[in-house]
């Protein structure tokens, strides 16, 4: 039988309740809320999770720059947060977003543009012109 939730079942969310890796990061998958397409994966720390929830603009942690990365801040290809979901182990996030323009830095709609078929790589998506 399916459990029915009521207002008393709601729990206040805190980024500190997530399980971060040894670098203090958690993976976050971005998914287009309208098409269901998987757009990208990037990392978040507790502060970037909090910033994302506060601003509604998806904010990642750049491991290479060691700084916050507000998606689309320089390119204009923003990700507007619709809903943030936590997986069952609390060690991964799913950001349901409205994506403006391409999500990938290669100018493709998705970062997942290479398929492996019969042991060979196939480019299945071209850059947006």
Swiss-Prot record:
One of its GO terms (molecular function) is phosphoribosyl-AMP cyclohydrolase activity. One of its GO terms (cellular component) is cytoplasm. Its EC number is 3.5.4.19. Catalyzes the hydrolysis of the adenine ring of phosphoribosyl-AMP. It comes from Ruegeria sp. (strain TM1040) (Silicibacter sp.). It catalyses: 1-(5-phospho-beta-D-ribosyl)-5'-AMP + H2O = 1-(5-phospho-beta-D-ribosyl)-5-[(5-phospho-beta-D-ribosylamino)methylideneamino]imidazole-4-carboxamide. It is found in: Cytoplasm. GO terms for biological process: L-histidine biosynthetic process. This is Phosphoribosyl-AMP cyclohydrolase. Pathway: Amino-acid biosynthesis; L-histidine biosynthesis; L-histidine from 5-phospho-alpha-D-ribose 1-diphosphate: step 3/9. Gene3D superfamilies: Phosphoribosyl-AMP cyclohydrolase. Belongs to the PRA-CH family. Disulfide bonds: none annotated.
